[in-house]
Amino acid sequence: MDTNDDPDEDHLTSYDIQLSIQESIEASKTALCPERFVPLSAQNRKLVEAIKQGHIPELQEYVKYKYAMDEADEKGWFPLHEAVVQPIQQILEIVLDASYKTLWEFKTCDGETPLTLAVKAGLVENVRTLLEKGVWPNTKNDKGETPLLIAVKKGSYDMVSTLIKHNTSLDQPCVKRWSAMHEAAKQGRKDIVALLLKHGGNVHLRDGFGVTPLGVAAEYGHCDVLEHLIHKGGDVLALADDGASVLFEAAGGGNPDCISLLLEYGGSGNVPNRAGHLPIHRAAYEGHYLALKYLIPVTSKNAIRKSGLTPIHSAADGQNAQCLELLIENGFDVNTLLADHISQSYDDERKTALYFGVSNNDVHCTEVLLAAGADPNLDPLNCLLVAVRANNYEIVRLLLSHGANVNCYFMHVNDTRFPSVIQYALNDEVMLRLLLNNGYQVEMCFDCMHGDIFGNSFVWSEIQEEVLPGWTSCVIKDNPFCEFITVPWMKHLVGRVTRVLIDYMDYVPLCAKLKSALEVQREWPEIRQILENPCSLKHLCRLKIRRLMGLQKLCQPASVEKLPLPPAIQRYILFKEYDLYGQELKLT
């Protein structure tokens, strides 16, 4: 039908225009609030004082001065505004009768009308008096709230009933199209919801996000309101603008009774929102354990696969270890990877649930996932690198004990000849030794082209120096440790770090570049003394045993305990004398 031929549509359009103009005028008045009022007269001050003190005889005398009724204070309050927020009905009637009708809709500087002030004050009789005198019941305050919405927020059934009897608009939208019905559902006031519906309230109203009162009741976990709305025609299958179902909202609220009720009336756990998330994802992320128990059996594996992420990811992201345990008990795979389109939405391109736990510094979730068999080496940016950079010793210890690759590389950040993880531990001996004790390839830190294994310096060709003055080809192809550690802003660490590294080697081939940097460090005399003397046979045997065992067994305490060796020797093989973190926790 052509909208030009629809009289109802024309009426609504005209009404909208009228309201828009009125709101613009009131907004401009409020903006100029301080300038629109003149200094108060003595009669006005006496009149206001009589209102506040409840002195009726004096008030009856002062209201004869009409000019005093038309004066407002610095807050924009006229005597009528003062009268509506005091409890004596007779005082309000006197002031109301003495005021011009044009003042009945005047707003304070805060944008409140006499009616909205009376409603906020919870004075039902004052509200009734204003309405009976003919005050318009639908004028919003400057926050966009109608008197009805304010009454619902106050939780006053009598106030709501009074407004309805005086023809207030039940479905009038407020800010973001939020209505009185939505607010009643949010507050869990079944009696007010029933009252609104009885007088023609719309159960299918949508707020600015497309959410119905049914969705609001589900989100806030009000099962009795939810059931009442369903019985009155609420659509269980309604979707919000973002595609969220009513069941999705209930999953966010976490009330298992609401979820059970929605499932009973046809709600589906397999309807994703526009982001692809299912109700089970929402419950797992929010940590709603009981809700999750309801959703696991009603959510299909195919729907989860299509979503691109598992509830395991959601629970880890939300740091909810109890939900993780429940999901693992129900057969969810801790090593399922995020879909590529989701992974690529993160700067680090994370893929595993374990990565979420590690990046959140969540020791408990990390422990739960690793105990369930999570592989710490599946992400493009290894979880160990993230934990070391965050300086989280316990997560680093957990990852290493469950097979994290201590010799991993992250080539997107820095193309180094040596394994990347040590970069983040150079200024922390506790972390550095934690990595070295667990098999870090320390020899790679001394592998470069600046000299041979006998310490003879390597002379670069003049052609290379001409092409890249001050640089060498190995810096371009893969940056050796000696180049990395001797840059001006890290040079102060070279002595301390090298002193730690040589505890884990048999022969240390110092190149000319590294040696020249060390010679000016205070650790150099000690380092030189160590290098000039042969290693102890005990230490050489330790290194040989570690190489024969392999990294995987070394990181598993149970494997070492099976060796036919006394505990003291086992501890020596594991470099326990250098386990500073374990000593702090009394683990060694």
UniProtKB/Swiss-Prot annotation:
Keywords: ANK repeat, Repeat, Ubl conjugation pathway. One of its GO terms (biological process) is protein ubiquitination. May be a substrate-recognition component of a SCF-like ECS (Elongin-Cullin-SOCS-box protein) E3 ubiquitin-protein ligase complex which mediates the ubiquitination and subsequent proteasomal degradation of target proteins. Belongs to the ankyrin SOCS box (ASB) family. The gene is ASB15. The SOCS box domain mediates the interaction with the Elongin BC complex, an adapter module in different E3 ubiquitin-protein ligase complexes. Pathway: Protein modification; protein ubiquitination. ANK repeats lie at residues 110-142, 143-174, 176-208, 209-241, 242-274, 307-339, 349-380, 381-413, 416-444. Residues 524-579 form the SOCS box domain. This is Ankyrin repeat and SOCS box protein 15. SMART domains: ANK, SOCS, SOCS_box. SUPFAM superfamilies: Ankyrin repeat, SOCS box-like. One of its GO terms (cellular component) is cytosol. It comes from Homo sapiens (Human). InterPro entries: Ankyrin_rpt, Ankyrin_rpt-contain_sf, SOCS_box, SOCS_box-like_dom_sf.
